[in-house]
């Protein structure tokens, strides 16, 4: 008999960004205990990892019941990903669209690697629920964000590790406006303000420029999506 989520532990892929912060709140609402995992892979916006502490502290302060559920925070360094990737997320080059139609911010295999490492850690921790912020609605066309990719990987992980992992992607069908709305649904304006102020999305790692939707350069694709989502969210609650 499979235990209900309210009695299980989840491992959340937690970068410090808007999507992963929303997924963390989603998991805290559903599971008995929640651990987090971040990756240092040589990303230009590594400042996102520094945002995690503020987000964790903020969520614990916002909801005492969430504070009791927060477990260990893990960080894995995988510099090899940057060594084998020639992308604008790991090298100091201009962000542009490649001949394939994908932006050069695409890091080949990144989510596949992240979820495989997460599953290996979950295996050791006795955890079968893994939560990620992948989304195929409002995204840059990354093939490893697609639902069919995640479902196929789940099958491979379960076969390769002889486990029954569940890969939860609560944002898969949501655009960025709906992601802001989900944060409001989970934690009210307090959570929305926490994510707006303390999460990081900008590909260039800019934290000096403050906008209505948070910090960022305001020009990169990630900032554009976040800003567009914020405007849509405001229109929905008006």
UniProtKB/Swiss-Prot annotation:
Pathway membership, UniProt: Purine metabolism; 7-cyano-7-deazaguanine biosynthesis
Secreted in keyword set: no
GO terms for MF: ATP binding; ligase activity, forming carbon-nitrogen bonds; zinc ion binding
Residues that coordinate or bind ATP: 14-24
Catalytic activity: 7-carboxy-7-deazaguanine + NH4(+) + ATP = 7-cyano-7-deazaguanine + ADP + phosphate + H2O + H(+)
Source taxon at top rank: Bacteria
EC number: 6.3.4.20
The entry's keywords: ATP-binding, Ligase, Metal-binding, Nucleotide-binding, Queuosine biosynthesis, Zinc
Residue positions binding Zn(2+): 202, 217, 220, 223
Role noted for this protein: Catalyzes the ATP-dependent conversion of 7-carboxy-7-deazaguanine (CDG) to 7-cyano-7-deazaguanine (preQ(0)).
Name recorded for this polypeptide: 7-cyano-7-deazaguanine synthase
Species of the source: Nitrobacter winogradskyi (strain ATCC 25391 / DSM 10237 / CIP 104748 / NCIMB 11846 / Nb-255)
Gene: queC
